[in-house]
Amino acid sequence: MSKLDDLIQKLCPDGVEYKPLSEIFNTRNGYTPSKKEKNFWENGTVPWFRMEDIRENGGILDHAMQYVSINAIKGDPFPANSIIVATSATIGEHALITVPSIANQRFTYLMIKNQYRNEYDPKFLYYYCFKLDEYCKECLNQGNFASVDMKKFSKFQFPRLPMEIQR
């Protein structure tokens, strides 16, 4: 048995509980501020993430290749330690974003609900989302444009493990 198996057996003697994505996270789609509004794109301070950021800088990100001004934001930026998941076009990629930010419309933000903040380690969720990536590829809507079936997406199951195991 592996060390992980030993920990699970020791700390979860009754088995591992699973929770659906929709119970653990609030979700919202990313967006692109209007390119016609020059002031949205000049002297920006809020990171705006695109697929290129993941490809160039990896899956745990604290800065973006492009920034937008606070005037470009609809409401508030998405909170730090959110996960972005590609749910259209290039499906099956994700990143942990460790700073307040926005991302383009290819991404769905997963923002952990307050009642689960102390129960999940952001890096554990990031690594577990590699399973979500594969699940997304199996849950596509039929049509001309590849996109994830969001009803199925919301049902994806995350294990509820003790922090000792997550870390």
What are these regions (language model features)?
Residues 5-13, 35-38, 95, 144-145, ...:
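Short, recurring structural edge motifs at helix starts
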Residues 22-37, 52-80:
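Sequence-specific dsDNA recognition surfaces
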Residues 7-31, 163:
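Non-catalytic DNA-recognition/assembly elements of restriction-modification systems
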Residues 108, 127-158:
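Specificity-determining recognition surfaces
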Residues 16-24, 46, 81-84, 153:
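Short, structured motif recognition centered on aromatic/hydrophobic residues
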Residues 15-17, 121, 154-167:
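Amphipathic alpha-helical segments
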Residues 96-109:
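Short, compositionally biased
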